[in-house]
Amino acid sequence: MISEIKSILEDPEGDLLNWMVPRPKAEDENWYNWNIENWGTKWSLSDVYIDNCAEEDSIEFSFSTAWAPPIDAFRSWAERDGRVQFNLEYWEPGCAFVGSAIYDGDYFDDEYIDGNSEPDAYKLRASADWGYEEWEEPEPLTEWYKQGVEDKGLNK
């Protein structure tokens, strides 16, 4: 199974989440809602980097997803397969969330910290787990918008 996962991850057209929890053809027009409901995120994995694949029974890799971690896909796959265990660690600085999810074959647990509602916990976890230390306060959208209007000369 690990070699199959590795080949999917190495294929530029590979779609690991669809391999884990296949989207029915009948849902192709409703892909957005189906993906969110079944994978937990809107698109499959991108920017995949295989960190370690030395053993036939484990693989470590990092990836990007849109807006949310694909915990639902990993959990459904693990519960259906019976041989799968996982430990996900994730951080999304753009949307300001960080967390983890584990499944050991019997027990599932996850922790999600929203940086907008729990800024201190978010900063602590992102610093401890990801080494991130540069904390900039987000610029208000109105200031960003005003600057864009000015830069494009739309205020004249």
What residues fall within each predicted segment?
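Intrinsic low-complexity, intrinsically disordered or marginally ordered coil/linker segments
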Residues: 1-156
